[in-house]
Structure formats: structure tokens, C-alpha cells
UniProtKB/Swiss-Prot annotation:
Top-level enzyme category: transferase
Functional summary from the UniProt entry: Plays an essential role in proper timing of early development events.
Entry PTM: Autophosphorylated.
Protein name per the record: Serine/threonine-protein kinase Pkn1
Binding site for ATP: 65-73, 88
Lineage of producing organism: Bacteria, Pseudomonadati, Myxococcota, Myxococcia, Myxococcales
Gene label: pkn1
Cysteine disulfide links: none
Catalyzed chemical reaction(s): L-seryl-[protein] + ATP = O-phospho-L-seryl-[protein] + ADP + H(+); L-threonyl-[protein] + ATP = O-phospho-L-threonyl-[protein] + ADP + H(+)
Organism encoding this protein: Myxococcus xanthus
Listed InterPro entries: Kinase-like_dom_sf, PilZ_domain, Prot_kinase_dom, Protein_kinase_ATP_BS, Ser/Thr_kinase_AS, TPR_rpt
Domain of life of the organism encoding this protein: Bacteria
Domain Protein kinase, chain residue ranges per copy: 59-328
The UniProt record lists the keyword Transferase: yes
Repeat region (TPR), residues: 630-663
Enzyme Commission number(s): 2.7.11.1
Length: 693
């Protein structure tokens, strides 16, 4: 979803093109059936985006990053802790189509099923009206489409496509076909090392190939025609070989600088892919070797059975063809030249403002076509890569509180930079996007910093990548002292030691921290010392008291482990305040815990019927079995109430509300019956701390 440029553009895709040109909107009426696209191209009025500043869950939309056929993507910032995500919002005019709203569910489900590091992560979603959205990881980089239009180096192309193949192989192994692969949906991000790291995006029209799912409506074409396999545009069944065909088109485009078919218009593109053989890549760009040409043309075979049997086979063929390409090129190049030209690609530079910008977060800087992707004919011999600074190879011992309330554990840190480091040597891996207090044990003394987990490498992935099991963190609140110490280490300079006064634990502080540790082991109510039926005013009061308590602790002389514990407690209090501090978030939090008394307090504090109904649908979608059992209790309670057995009826209502606490009618009936009984209630069970409202 590239950024919409100023001026007129297509209302569906946000791009400028003629009225008859093919529009990359994901849903089109089948021109073979005489249909028209919906919506048809219309001018885009450039104005202040009405969604900027709007809150989606815990995130506020800061600015729009890109716009595409199904929706727009915004930079989102957490309202309390400032963490950044990408928020994908469905276009308002498309919310009337249930099949498109369903694709938001499908995208989140598909990505969750696959769980591969080369696929963009989706953290949360809300498919309820009026604004369905997805919460995704924020990527710093640019789409592959930023570099199409000129032939690129074979080594760089194969490196990128191999990572795409890895992602698709994981998807196909779970029966998921992407169905809309194109350079816009392949994102290159910055990672440590030289090679661009690939993220595959937009599984919104992915389909479970072997599931009993409703087929696409008759007369509707789903995908992008320039990259669509013949069987897909003809409405036949598709499998992973349709994705393989799209990768063949992308490989053709990257190596030659143009698409295999340049026909204008949706119908012309579809017919070309269905009937016409593509021109040999070497006829477009002679530098394409015969080996690579053979692989591409086989991937572009009209019949699926004539292509490679799997993405893995295609990946292997690319690697073999690249090796042959290097050998052939070496015979045509003076000794030593190619060894430099064909080295592993480096991290991509950002495109200029005139080029397509990354939709999931791009730090766009003035630059040029990256040396990693430029064709060998466009580059000169490059000097050898500079040696890695000695400090970056030195492991830094750290202490980390991995779970709230626990003591810090010692880990090893590597890959140190001003932005963060990679931690390994432990058995527990924290969740992605969680915040952890970290103490760097430097020669100058311990330095404490709050970090956010941005990458998790479990054992299986660690074996594949030849790296230790661990997790990467970025510094969230790095001080000037920390930055200076890291800079000194990276430059190989000794860090000037600061005299340290040995600290002993204050018994009073130790007792307070132990009390806090016990509180933090519970739920949000326990962290803030609240009863489950506390009103919103009490929640805010206890939140302020918790912050003051932690601030007073920080005034003491704390040992590094104690300071790490306080940092972890601050994270825990912040999480509890976010869960209980607003009526909508608290009502959903209470629903998951069966706390109907808390839901009642949210209604008293102004939770609207529309908000409650939206939460109810989300709750039942995730716990569809809950309502059946709850309804049985509600019916039993109704029968007992009619029979005059009010105490027993109240008990049945209570049991039902613990399973389905967002049923407003039953909440009202329960509270009315309590009043009839004069405030008497059934005794709470041992695990229910809730008091009678």
C-alpha cells in the first residue's frame, strides 16, 4: 500500500492510472462476466486524514503510512508506554461487504497459524463496526516495489526470493495459499548483518487450500492481475503452485526490470497470462543467464503440473541456477572481479521521496538504488567490507527480570548497538513486544534500561539460522550515560569506571519489595490492591497510590537486582492501569475472568450498550461454547425464580454470569433479584475474591 501522492488518484488503490488501466484493488468484478469493479476509480481528495488522532484499542493513530485497495495503514503509538505498531484499517466504503470484513479475520488467523519470522506479525485485531482494524508489527524498511523498474543483481534477487520461499513453504505446509504475492507485499527491513531481511505481508486473501471454506463469490476475481496464475483468474482451484507462479513473475520483473506482459487493462493482463508465452528474460535483458531463465520460465508454465512441485523445489532450483550463473559470469569477468560483485547483498538503502515508501513504517532518506540490489553492470568494484569493531564481538553480561515478581536472571548479550542487543543463555523466552527491565553489567558499573522484546528466536529457528536461542531487545528509555557507554564499547574504547560504593540491602526495602512481589503475582486487581467490584474512582485512586509507592522506593539506595525489580513492578502497574483504567478495556478484562461485578461497575461508569454489545460479540467469538452452558444456568434460574426459590435462582444466575458476564439482560435480572432478597447473596467460592455489590 504505497503512500498516496498529492493530486488525483484511484479511489480504490490510491495510485494514478488511466480509467482503463488495471487497478490493484484486491476485489474486482469478473470482466469475463460483464461486471465492473467496485468501487470504480474516483478522484482522491487530499485532505487531513480523519482517522489521524483516532484511538484503536490502546493505540492512537499518529500518521498514515500507506493506502491500498482494502485499507490504509497507520503508525500507531501506545497511549501510555509509547510503543509503535502498524494499524491496518479497512476502508469505510468496504465495511458493507461481509466477505471483506471476513478477510481481516482470515489474515490474522492465517498469520497466527503460520508463525514464521519472514511473515509480518499480527498482535491483535478488532473486526467489529465501524472500523475493523489489525495491530501489526511496525517495520523499518521499504517494499520490494521501491526497486522495480531496473534490472537487479542475480545474487540479491535470489537472496530475497529465497526468504520469500521460506515463508511460503511454512504457509503451504499448513495448507495456506497467499494468492496475492507481488513486490508491494514483500518488505525489506534492516537487520544486523548485510543481507536484507524479508517480511511477507497481506495474507488478507489467503485461503486454506484444504479446508471446507466458502468459495469466492461467483463473478469475483481476487488478486493482482499482473502476478496472477492462469488457474486463479479462471476461477479454478488453487494450491501453492499459484504462489509459485507469482514468484516467477516477480523474479522475471526483478532480473529484467519489466513485467513479462505489459498489456494495459485488467482483461488484457488476464488473457496474456492465460494464453501467451512470456518473452524469454534474456531477450529483455541479455545478462540473465540461461540457467536462471530456465527456472523462471518453468515457474511461469500455464499448467500447474508443469511448474515445480513445491516452493522448496523452486528455491533449490534458484540456488543451483545462481551457482551456474556465477560460474558463467566468472568466465566473462576478469579474475577477482566477480568475487566482489556477487558477495552477499547488504542492507537496503531507503528509496528517495519520489519512490514508493514503506507502508509499515519507513525512515525514508535521500538515497539511490541500493548497492545490494543494483545490477552488476551498474556497479564498480567495491572495496572489501570493513572489519567488525572489536567491541561488537564482546559479550555483555546482563541481568533481566523475565517475569513480574521474579528475581533477575543472568544472561549474555551480544550484537550490542545504540538501539539494543541480543540476549541468550537462558531457558525462558519472553513474549514478543513485552517490556523488560535490563541491567547491563559494564566495567564502569551497572546501567539499568527499560527494553522491549522485538525478536524471539526459539530453539527450532536457532538451529536453522545457526545462532543461539534467545531474544532481541531494543532500548526504550536509554539515558545519555548508557548511550555514551555503548558508543565507547563499539569504538573499542575502555569505558571509564565510576567508583562504586558497595550496597547492602535495606531490610525495610526488602520487605516492601516482597510484599509487591506477592501482589504482582496476581491479576490486575491484585497489583492495584483492588476488589473486583471496585468502582472506577477507586481504580484511579489506587493506581495513583501504587505509583507513589514505587516512586518512594526509588528514593532509597537500591542494589542492581532491587532496581531491576522496581522497574519490573512499574511495568506491571502500568499494565494493570491500562487493563482497568478505562471502561471498555476493563469490561473485556473482567469478561475473560468471569467477573460480572466488574462489568456492572463499567456500566455504572458509562459503558454504552453499543460498546457492550461489541465486546459481547468479540467474547463469544473466542469462547463460543460459553454461551451454551451459561444459557442452561439462566434457564434454570428463571424456572427457580418462577417457582419462588429465589436464593437458588440467584445462585444459577451467578453461575451463568461467570461464564457469560457480558449478558446485560441477565446482569439486570441478577441485580434486581439481589435487591428483592435484601442484599443477601450466595457465599463466594474459595477462588472468587469478589465481594457482593
Amino acid at each position: 500500500m504505497p503512500e498516496v501522492s498529492s493530486g488525483g488518484g484511484c479511489g480504490a488503490c490510491g495510485r494514478r492510472h488511466g480509467a482503463d488501466a488495471s487497478c490493484p484493488t484486491l476485489v474486482r468484478a469478473d470482466v469475463r462476466a460483464g461486471g465492473t469493479a467496485h468501487p470504480r476509480c474516483a478522484p482522491v481528495v487530499e485532505a487531513q486524514d480523519p482517522l489521524v488522532g483516532v484511538r484503536c484499542g490502546s493505540f492512537r493513530l499518529v500518521r498514515r503510512l500507506g493506502r491500498g485497495g482494502m485499507g490504509a495503514v497507520y503508525l500507531g503509538e501506545h497511549v501510555s508506554i509509547g510503543s509503535r505498531v502498524a494499524v491496518k484499517v479497512l476502508h469505510a466504503h468496504l465495511t458493507m461487504y461481509p466477505e471483506l470484513v471476513q478477510r481481516f479475520h482470515a489474515e490474522a488467523r492465517a498469520v497466527n497459524l503460520i508463525g514464521h519470522e519472514n511473515i509480518v506479525s499480527i498482535f491483535d485485531m478488532d473486526a467489529t463496526p465501524p472500523r475493523p482494524y489489525l495491530i501489526m508489527e511496525f517495520l523499518d524498511g521499504a517494499p520490494l516495489s521501491a526497486w522495480v523498474g531496473t534490472p537487479l543483481a542475480a545474487g540479491a534477487v535470489v537472496s530475497v526470493l529465497s526468504q520469500v520461499c521460506d515463508a511460503l513453504q511454512a504457509a503451504h505446509a499448513r495448507g495456506i495459499v497467499h494468492r496475492d504475492l507481488k513486490p508491494d507485499n514483500i518488505f525489506l527491513v534492516r537487520r544486523n548483518g548485510n543481507a536484507p531481511f524479508v517480511k511477507v505481508l497481506d495474507f488478507g486473501i489467503a485461503k486454506l487450500a484444504d479446508a471446507h471454506m466458502p468459495q469466492t463469490h461467483a463473478g469475483i476475481i481476487v488478486g493482482t492481475p499482473e502476478y496472477m496464475a492462469p488457474e486463479q483468474s479462471l476461477g479454478r482451484g488453487v494450491d501453492g503452485r499459484a504462489d509459485l507462479y507469482a514468484l516467477g513473475v516477480i523474479a522475471y520483473q526483478l532480473l529484467t526490470g519489466r513485467l513479462p506482459f505489459n498489456d494495459e487493462g485488467l482483461a488484457a493482463q488476464l488473457v496474456a497470462h492465460q494464453l501467451r508465452p512470456p518473452p524469454p528474460p534474456s531477450s529483455v535483458y541479455p545478462a540473465v543467464s540461461a540457467a536462471l531463465e530456465h527456472v523462471i520460465l518453468r515457474a511461469l508454465a500455464k499448467k500447474p503440473e508443469d511448474r515445480y512441485a513445491s516452493i522448496a523445489a523452486f528455491r533449490n532450483a534458484l540456488q543451483v541456477a545462481l551457482a551456474e550463473h556465477v560460474r558463467v559470469s566468472a568466465r566473462k569477468t576478469r579474475p577477482g572481479g566477480l568475487a566482489v560483485l556477487e558477495r552477499a547483498p547488504v542492507a537496503p538503502d531507503m528509496p528517495t521521496e519520489g519512490q514508493s515508501r514503506g507502508r509499515l513504517g519507513v525512515d525514508a532518506r535521500a538515497g539511490h538504488v541500493p548497492s545490494s540490489l543494483a545490477s552488476t553492470s551498474q556497479r564498480r568494484l567495491a572495496p572489501a567490507a570493513p572489519a567488525v569493531p572489536r567491541a561488537s564481538l564482546v559479550e555483555v553480561p546482563v541481568q533481566v527480570v523475565l517475569r513480574p515478581g521474579e528475581s533477575p536472571v543472568r544472561l549474555r548479550g551480544s550484537g550490542l548497538s545504540r538501539g539494543g542487543l541480543f540476549l541468550h543463555g537462558g531457558r525462558v523466552l519472553p513474549p514478543l513486544c513485552s517490556r523488560l527491565p535490563v541491567v547491563l553489567e559494564l566495567a564502569s558499573g551497572p546501567l539499568s534500561v527499560m527494553c522491549e522484546v522485538v525478536r524471539v528466536v526459539p530453539p527450532a529457528q536457532a538451529r536453522v539460522w545457526g545462532m543461539p536461542t534467545g531474544f532481541g531487545v531494543q532500548f526504550v528509555e536509554a539515558t545519555a550515560v548508557l548511550k555514551a557507554a555503548v558508543d565507547a564499547l563499539l569504538q573499542g574504547e575502555p569505558v571509564r569506571a565510576v567508583p562504586q560504593v558497595p550496597l547492602t540491602e535495606d531490610p525495610a526495602v526488602a520487605r516492601l519489595l516482597e510484599a509487591w512481589r506477592q501482589r504482582s503475582a496476581g491479576d490486575a486487581y491484585a497489583v492495584l490492591a483492588l476488589e473486583p467490584d471496585s468502582d472506577m474512582g477507586t481504580v484511579r485512586l489506587r493506581t495513583r497510590e501504587a505509583w507513589r509507592s514505587l516512586e518512594s522506593l526509588e528514593q532509597h539506595s537500591l542494589t542492581p537486582p532491587q532496581r531491576a525489580q522496581v522497574d519490573a513492578l512499574r511495568v506491571r502497574v502500568r499494565e494493570a492501569a491500562e487493563a482497568l483504567g478505562a471502561t471498555v478495556q476493563r469490561a473485556l478484562y473482567d469478561a475473560w475472568r468471569g467477573n460480572h461485578r466488574g462489568v456492572a461497575k463499567c456500566l455504572e461508569a458509562g459503558l454504552t450498550a453499543e460498546q457492550l454489545e461489541s465486546l459481547r460479540r468479540e467474547f463469544l467469538a473466542r469462547r463460543p461454547q460459553a454461551m451454551g452452558t451459561a444459557r442452561s444456568h439462566f434457564q434454570s434460574g428463571g424456572a427457580l425464580e418462577r417457582d419462588g426459590q429465589l436464593s437458588q435462582a440467584l445462585d444459577q444466575y451467578e453461575r451463568g454470569l461467570k461464564l457469560a458476564p457480558l449478558e446485560v439482560d441477565m446482569l439486570q435480572r441478577y441485580r434486581r433479584l439481589r435487591r428483592v432478597l435484601g442484599g443477601r447473596a450466595t457465599a463466594p467460592t474459595g477462588h472468587d475474591r469478589a465481594r457482593s455489590p
